[in-house]
Amino acid sequence: MAFDWFKRKTKNITTSTEDKKDVPKGLWHQTPTGKIIEHEELKANNYVSPEDGFHVRIGSREFFSILFDDNKFTELDANVESVDMLGFKDTKAYVDRLKEVKAKTKLTDSIRNAVGRVNGEQMVISCMDFAFIGGSLGSVMGEKIRRAVDYCIANRLPYMIICQSGGARMQEATYSLMQLAKVQAKLAQLSEEGLLYIAYLCDPTFGGITASFAMTADIIMAEPGALIGFAGPRVIRETIGKDLPEGFQTSEFLQEKGFVDFIVKRTEIKEKVSKTVKLLVH
């Protein structure tokens, strides 16, 4: 045949791997702009690329390490876990999905509460984990935020929520949607007590989170370039049949329109939060 020269004459050719070197996973990170960053350098810079300023998506472990002095904090309500109240099943049973994501992430749900000091200022921080079913809002998130607010009221402490979520958890249906009202009611109590509430919006913050407590904080901060909105840009574009403005739904766009108070780099968030607490609490 004309293309016989493409064929191997000898089958099952093997290549020796004796001299090959394994590269540990996570040793290097590539940003969307193509910049290659060594993992240790990235970690030392709070997971922000020093080359282009890109903020790599991180979870509660990293955020607590960045914010709390010497990474010392006490986790609150760690034993609260999701249950399959509806026997829900989509492509797989919800109970099986929970087991898989818990094993993969070593988390119990999509949010963690902790109390500690940020540059000496004691406060409570709730941080969402996007790696746990997209940081979705379920009954556990609502309950943990309720308990965090009660702790703040009992101990007269400021409160911060780090938001990164795709919205409500569909597997919990109405139970999930009920959490919006539940959380807002508790945050109203926090406000009535004269206690500070700070929200830090990270990429992405969407759905019911944006439609409720992400946008009702006393001070709203956001990471540079974070996507923030209710529905995604593709859904909006297909619904209205028009192209969207450039930079639509970015934190910078929202600050320009008055929805975000400050754009704060992750490398500066600890200092910004502690200064805000000093200014507004003392």
UniProtKB/Swiss-Prot annotation:
Coiled-coil ranges per UniProt: none
Nucleotide-binding is among the record's keywords: yes
GO molecular function per UniProt: acetyl-CoA carboxylase activity; ATP binding; carboxyl- or carbamoyltransferase activity
This protein's record includes keyword Phosphoprotein: no
Source superkingdom: Bacteria
Keywords: ATP-binding, Cytoplasm, Fatty acid biosynthesis, Fatty acid metabolism, Lipid biosynthesis, Lipid metabolism, Nucleotide-binding, Transferase
Compartments where located: Cytoplasm
Catalytic activity as recorded in UniProt: N(6)-carboxybiotinyl-L-lysyl-[protein] + acetyl-CoA = N(6)-biotinyl-L-lysyl-[protein] + malonyl-CoA
HAMAP family cross-referenced by the UniProt entry: AcetylCoA_CT_beta
Subunit architecture: Acetyl-CoA carboxylase is a heterohexamer composed of biotin carboxyl carrier protein (AccB), biotin carboxylase (AccC) and two subunits each of ACCase subunit alpha (AccA) and ACCase subunit beta (AccD).
Alphabetical list of NCBIfam families matching this protein: accD
Name listed for the protein in its UniProt record: Acetyl-coenzyme A carboxylase carboxyl transferase subunit beta
